[in-house]
Amino acid sequence: MQGRDACVALWLNLMQGEKTSMSTTVKPTEAGTAFLTTPVSESADKIFTLEQRDDEQRWIAESAATFAQREIVPNVEAIDHQEPGVMPGLLKKAGEQGLLSIDVPEAYGGAELGLLTSAMVASEFRDGSFGTAHGAHTTIGTLPIVFYGTEAQKQQYLPKLASGEWIAAYALTEPGVGSDAMGLSTRAELSEDGKYYILNGTKQWISNAGFADLMIVFARIGKERPSAFIVEANWPGISTGAEERKMGIKGSSTRQVYFENAKVPVENLLGEIHKGYKIAFNILNIGRLKLGAGAAVGSRNALNLAATYTTERKAFGKFLHEFGLIKKKLARMAAETYAAESEAFRTAANIEQARRSAGENTEAAFNAIEEYAIEASIAKVHGSEVLAYAVDEGVQIFGGYGFMQEYPIEKAYRDARIQRIYEGTNEINRLVTSGTLFRRVMSGKLDLMARFPTIEARVKSGQAPDFAGEAIPAELRTAVNALERAKDVTIYAAMRIAMKYMQAIEQEQEFMDYLANLLIDVYAIDSALARATQAVRRGDENSATHIKLAQLATWLAFSRIRLNLDQMIMTNINEDQVEKELARIRAYLGDFLLNGVTLQRELAAIVVEKRGYPL
């Protein structure tokens, strides 16, 4: 059974409650932040890569892509102009085809396929506006009830959300405080009869607000930390403002939501009282991860548009793809995308397996998501910035035509900008990445203290071992050794500077930014090199392409790593020690010697032949 017919059969089985092998197709979990201390030679066979998708996962992703091609693409103009009923109608159609139910347990009308599969599906919709609406519904709108709802709440709401009968929204952000869950001003006061919480306040920039039937709302009860509530949008006292006029994702509904003495039954408190901030943080981690996966696929789409255009457009008597600077752009777009998607789906698989291991234990489920907070933030930041790079270069390749609305790269450029802002700005996520690293060290979850003396001795000696050895394919050994040296100097520099700042370290935001940049590049190329190593070990027919993509991703990241290390040392080490520490780190880090121009030309040729992403 092939293609669409297989997809249809699979979805029929799923919607009828039949089990598939999908629910168990996940690699063993690696601990959070393990990428920093585990060599690629050990991790390569443990991590999940897209090449490990089974037939069912491929079919489901294909069905989402088919839905996008048949239902979304023909309606792009109507979506962008917010023609009445178009977006909610598309969401309901998606529900009819099972595309809203992937994360929902079977007991409540869902497919129960898990985070990994839902991330694959969410990344296939190819339209920023629909992707925003779909994510607001399935991730931040539905998952709080899946993860933290009572049995009664799940029975009451999840079947409607899974089918698309109801559409969900997530109301956290407020005027003046953004997404600071600890600074909310919306209040919830218990009524005199003890039957209701009375909500008063304003929420801002709420996706799906114009047509949502249900909202996850965060508000303070007294002066304590915020609590979460399941709120039906048609209850008295709830209203919305006008649609916001936006730069991009114009077709998504974005409004303010007002609560004026809105009565919410006490049984609609979600999770524990005063613990809503935990729900907010953990659901945001899932949202960040899915955003990263979607951004990576968005980069693929931008590359596909650009690569195809270079085979059609001529300048100075030659096709665009024949020019060296165009080859450079195509190759770099492909390599950066490869790294971004590698880290995103690796993280999705780890979170899914950890949650599955937690079972019905709510506290363990909280911890399972929190375990990968660093990786989720990295996936979001790196994925969104790779997308920004890809669409920007896409517009540049199209030239003046890329500035015209008739060409899809123009819309892709506008829609991409928001990705660096929502689910926490990239600046906030960088601080989350570095801050969480130090909290993991201080709690003993990450044993950098114990490792530091060995790493310090290596760095001071200037002699790095052969980290790769025979376990790594010959073509990747130089890149892997460069990566492992980068891990060592990242740990060395971070711990040296941490000893200077001690408890005040999180106030040094510039240092935290440098460190986050290092962690982002290390995780990205660790994921890329592990994926390429895995491809070679299993004899993948595209292993040569994997190698080129991973090598170029490493070469590009290595220069950024060197720059961030230099600037971190120059600005945070005592002045009389700077010269010595710079010399020490530079000597140990060394170089990653590679003819990047030759590699870019080789990779660009594959991109042009494929008319897009080479895998």
Question: Where do the model's predicted regions map?
Answer:
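C-terminal helix-coil-helix/basic helical segment that borders enzyme active sites and/or dimer interfaces
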Residues: 76-82, 338-382, 395-398, 502, ...
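Glycine-rich phosphate/cofactor-binding loops in nucleotide/flavin-utilizing enzymes
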Residues: 23-46, 120, 140, 282, ...
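Amphipathic, small/basic residue-rich leader segments at the start of a protein or domain
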Residues: 12-136, 146, 152-156, 160-163, ...
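A short, Trp-centered hydrophobic/proline-enriched beta-strand micro-motif
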Residues: 164-172
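A short core secondary-structure module
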Residues: 195-240
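C-terminal amphipathic alpha-helical interaction region
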Residues: 461-469, 474-615
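Glycine-rich beta->alpha junctions and the first turn(s) of the following alpha-helix
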Residues: 24-26, 48-53, 58-60, 239-341, ...
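N-terminal glycine-rich flavin-associated loop
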Residues: 133-152, 178-181, 190-193
